[in-house]
């Protein structure tokens, strides 16, 4: 489905049948099995014809955690067996001294990295899927006569989230049900451990950590056969104690859905190539954490499995950085699991699951948001807040329970859902109390994040919270939000949605009754197709900066001072400004 159909106006009373939208290519994701003789078989099922596919593979280099997989050989002998597409290769071809970068022969264990690249003639492109498979040799050290054993594998992660001065949450996924343990230790410190019950998705909270200390951690998993394997080791730093935490650097970016070009720019709904460069750039710049303000994926799908697949691909894209730097995710309009009726009606699904519930299932964010009404999607982990040093950050959802054509009474879901850009009353009441409490705790710098811009500048002037001024109730709710921000002294609100960078001064000439000006910052340059500036908006003279280059925003706080620097994908500084002085 072309999402432009959702912007068309159906004829009055014109409601067609429900339809499936945007099925993914891989109906069953590629999965590898390893035979004792070293033969690896990768099988997958598809939703449409795949005339050709290749399988690239290599062993993991343990000393290179921030590098993308380096692949050494290829197999292209595609066959169809029992309805599944099948590719095979001999792992022993990699277990030769000249290829043994992972020292598998010596250690007796290794991790195989592999990629399926399938031709999708329907769309004239290729689709890729990346995997990993842990294995061991019996006996050790490996020889040509050793038996190869497939081990339980950490196939996604680990990720570090919800870090503070004394705790952190580690999460990861395994290919089979496992019990899991994470061990963490600082230099010269005690080992801290956390455990997770049997399952494939593990979230483990480590407590009793020391403040301002770097920890190295290691996931360990054991399957039902008693086979034990390690996940990837990584490091993270706890935050300084609140009374010592006066300096802070964090990054903001959004809109990494598919671009145009290579398979990695259309990586299961994500522009992996650009996203990876920007995330690594933020880490190099010293960001303690990142806030990602929505449109992670292409979305707009009618099957929960297709949305899960895209969210998982996004996690795969940020995986190496996410092992060491917490990433706080927000929902955008493309995070959409929908019910769809021709010729263009849609609403966010609620049963058997919702996009909001899937979001909480895949990500680890604070869960201190408002309580949803009965029968409505949850706010859990898509509306939340947290303190970081002298700052307080609040994330709200301007695409909560999204519905197309919200102004139409003949919508098949009339009376349910909200329009794109609407921040509902429950969120505004929660945000009001949350910001007031942050001020009472003495937090000096307040920031709010939501995907839809109040004052769009390039690409989304026909929606966002503006809708070209066509919907007075939307404008009134927008102004209510901005008055609330100003009343609490919020320094800036960060948005995405538009695939560019802009900085706009919002003042009482734009919002009646605004107590003080503040910055609106749009940072949507993480890989989605570009938009140019549109200068016909009423606030064009208040736009202080605009740039179409891919980028992230770096917020740097030192005591009472807070400044922002906009950094391009190539490391150039595109803009600098004082967050405490919106003029």
Language-model-derived ranges and their functions:
Residues 252-254, 289-295, 323-333, 396, ...:
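Active-site neighborhood of phospho(di)ester-bond hydrolases with catalytic His/Asp-centered motifs
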Residues 292-298, 438-462:
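Short acidic, glycine-rich surface-loop motifs adjacent to enzyme active sites
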Residues 247, 251-254, 258-285, 292, ...:
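Internal alpha/beta domain cores that form substrate/cofactor-binding pockets in large enzymes
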Residues 172, 176, 286-297, 301, ...:
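Active-site beta-strand/loop signature of hydrolases that rely on acidic residues for catalysis
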Residues 1-264, 283-284, 443-446, 548, ...:
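Acidic, histidine-bearing metal-coordination/catalytic regions of metal-dependent phosphoesterases
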Residues 159, 219-237, 305-440, 465-472, ...:
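Extended active-site neighborhood of metal-dependent phosphoesterases/phosphodiesterases
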Residues 143, 217-219, 258-262, 298-302, ...:
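Active-site environment of divalent metal-dependent phosphoester hydrolases
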